[in-house]
Amino acid sequence: MCNLGVDFHDTISFAPDFFKEIFRTWGTKRYIVTGTPESRRGETIKQLEDMGITADLYDELLMGYEYNKSEMTIDHFHRMKVHKLQIIKDYNISIYFDDNPFYVEYLRNHNIIVFQTILNDKYLTEFENKNNFFTCNLQRGQFKYLADGESGQNNES
């Protein structure tokens, strides 16, 4: 039994039609996992519906803990990765999609098949200009090692 978990922001919201089709055809439980606080459940459901992700396509929306955006320091990401792992374990999710390299790195060694949604530069630029707390900009440096390797900067001396 392979229950599916998919992050909302910058995963489903990046490719809603793709995930709509996966949800529609998935044979077991389908969960949307978000770090968004429970107090914003109604707003989150509305955003999902606006993308065509209706309640009949998933089994449950699993929310994050309460926090203020001003608390989004590195400590927040450490707590959220543990929170997401607990949700994934509690709901027996064995396949999980998330865009955030911080979470992907943590989850990949916990007996979960993890897929990372890779965001294109256009999307990254559009959303980092809209929201100072936009976290998928963590992907900006993710491929720097490859670019540095092509330019010879990764060569060991």
Each PLM stretch: what is its role?
Residues 1-5, 138-139, 143-157:
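Non-catalytic pre-domain segments flanking phosphatase-related domains
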Residues 91-133:
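Acidic, Mg2+-coordinating phosphoryl-transfer loop and its flanking beta/alpha structural elements
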Residues 27-34, 44-53, 110-115, 128-143:
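Active-site regions of enzymes building and remodeling cell-envelope glycoconjugates
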Residues 9, 81, 85, 93, ...:
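Conserved glycosyltransferase catalytic-site signature
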Residues 1-74, 78:
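Alpha-helical substrate-recognition element adjacent to the catalytic core
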Residues 26-27, 89-92:
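Residue-level preference for short coil/turn positions at secondary-structure junctions
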Residues 48, 77-90:
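Short loop-to-alpha-helix "cap/lid" segments that border enzyme active sites
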